Regions:
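Radical SAM [4Fe-4S] cluster-binding motif and immediate context
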Residues: 2-169
Length: 170
């Protein structure tokens, strides 16, 4: 994206006790999950009705490189925000390709994901990539409520383990 329409001060964000020159970056659009509280499932339905295609789309590594090169050259950020509903909604192969691409930048970043997408392998990779912050959506502490009303069938043990893994790689 080109943010020249906005004042240059709009790039600055407070994060963890520091002011950062931050840019947002999309690796994918939409989300493959069907949580009841989110707009992505309805976007998926509307998009499919209108186009016959999937709303959840992933950018190619070549496209990501082109966009990152542009953002880094034009705005010289010292923080990247991956503007993605569930950053780790990708295969290990896709994660490895992204990790390889991002090794050229190593700019600290933050992102959002779900507990069940976090494992030792990915946490170690995120640390190598220079992750500053990870937001993990749990939405509710009660498993039955999560499963029955939010359609998030993720056991408490999985959620707790995700936070433990993240802490081990901090």
């Amino acid at each position: 994206p080109d943010w020249d329409l906005f004042e240059s001060g709009s790039l600055y964000r407070p994060m963890q006790g520091k002011i950062w020159r931050a840019v947002g970056f999309e690796t994918q659009r939409g989300c493959p999950y069907t949580c009841t509280f989110c707009n992505s499932p309805s976007n998926n339905v509307e998009y499919k009705a209108e186009t016959g295609g999937k709303f959840h789309r992933k950018k190619s590594i070549a496209r990501m490189k082109k966009e990152l090169d542009f953002l880094v050259k034009k705005y010289d950020p010292n923080l990247i925000y991956f503007v993605v509903d569930t950053f780790l909604a990708m295969s290990n192969r896709e994660f490895d390709e992204l990790k390889e691409l991002y090794s050229d930048y190593k700019i600290p970043f933050w992102m959002n994901t779900r507990a069940e997408t976090i494992n030792e392998y990915r946490a170690a990779g995120l640390a190598e990539m220079n992750m500053l912050r990870m937001n993990i959506g749990i939405e509710h502490g009660n498993y039955d409520y999560r499963r029955n009303y939010l359609k998030r069938n993720v056991k408490n043990e999985v959620q707790i383990r995700a936070f433990q893994i993240a802490a081990e790689h901090d």
